[in-house]
Swiss-Prot record:
Name under which the protein is recorded: Virulence plasmid protein pGP3-D
Keyword Ribonucleoprotein listed: no
Entry-linked Pfam families: Chlam_vir, Pgp3_helical, Pgp3_N
Superkingdom of the organism of origin: Bacteria
Keywords associated with the record: Plasmid
Organism, as annotated: Chlamydia muridarum (strain MoPn / Nigg)
InterPro entries named in the record: Chlamydia_pGP3, PGP3-D_N, pGP3_C
UniProt feature coiled coil, ranges: none
Length: 264
């Protein structure tokens, strides 16, 4: 065993040896290793520290060895804060998201006026248009009233859906009423009629309506405008046909497809 033997320490007999092998250990202990008992034979083990734990091992030939295990306060503090922060943040965001989702679901299922967006189309009408056609009591339910100012083809994405139609038209005439009519191709009369007014200056005349889609094939609509019983109407122009403020003006027609809600 090399440098080994017995010696008397105070009143006790001691055995000493270097490079000793214990049990079935196959290698001598190395720096900072200890002998660790197991359920079978002893093994060589090394103590290590994990997050938040400090480990100090003192061992030399001239002094008693020591192993000091303590708490690394700064690392432990930061570790705890990080863990608590993650849990608090996850809890708050999870609660907010779940609450928001539930509010939306409740709104959709309880509000019969709310629909789901499917498709959106927007058409611009630019340039000046003179509308000489009139709307009268005899032609308002036919396809002869007013003057056509635009045709719009839209394709539904779902059968049984509806289009919310919004037409905002800049119209001028010598003081009097303005009539707007939306016509669906194939119909024998307008599917929606609206009224506006101009006192000789440009005014925004609007038509708001909804139309039901019976299928998912492209459908064409036309918008007709004319004076109420009398008068010439100008679109995107002054009542005398001149440009408004010397610039080109634009009117808009939009179609928004929705699916009506059915509460049961």
């Amino acid at each position: 065993m090399g440098n080994s033997g017995f010696y008397l320490h105070n009143t006790s007999n001691c055995v000493f040896a270097d490079n000793i092998k214990v049990g079935q250990m196959t290698e001598p202990l190395t720096d900072q290793q200890i002998i660790l008992g197991t359920s079978t034979t002893p093994v060589a083990a090394k103590i290590t520290a994990s997050e938040g734990i400090s480990l100090t091992i003192t061992n030399n030939a001239q002094a008693n060895s020591s192993v000091n295990i303590g708490l690394d306060a700064e690392k432990a503090y930061q570790l705890i804060l990080d863990k608590l922060g993650d849990q608090i943040f996850d809890g708050i965001t999870g609660s907010i998201v779940e609450s928001a989702v539930q509010d939306i679901i409740d709104k959709i299922t309880s509000d019969p006026s709310l629909g789901l967006l499917k498709a959106f189309y927007n058409f611009q009408i630019t340039g000046k248009i003179q509308c000489n056609g009139l709307f009268t009591s005899s032609n308002v339910t036919t396809l002869l009233g007013g003057t056509e100012i635009g045709r719009f083809t839209v394709t539904p994405r779902s059968s049984g859906s509806m289009f919310l139609v919004s037409a905002d038209i800049i119209a001028s005439r010598m003081e009097g009423g303005v009539v707007l009519a939306l016509v669906k191709e194939g119909d024998t009369q307008p599917c929606a009629i609206s009224y506006g007014y101009s006192s000789g200056v440009p005014n925004l005349c609007s038509l708001k309506t909804c139309v039901t889609n019976s299928g998912s094939t492209p459908t064409t609509y036309s918008l007709r405008i004319g004076g109420l019983e009398s008068g010439v109407v100008w679109v995107n122009a002054l009542s005398n046909g001149n440009d408004i403020l010397g610039i080109t003006n634009t009117s808009n027609v939009s179609f928004l497809e929705v699916i009506p809600q059915k509460n049961t």
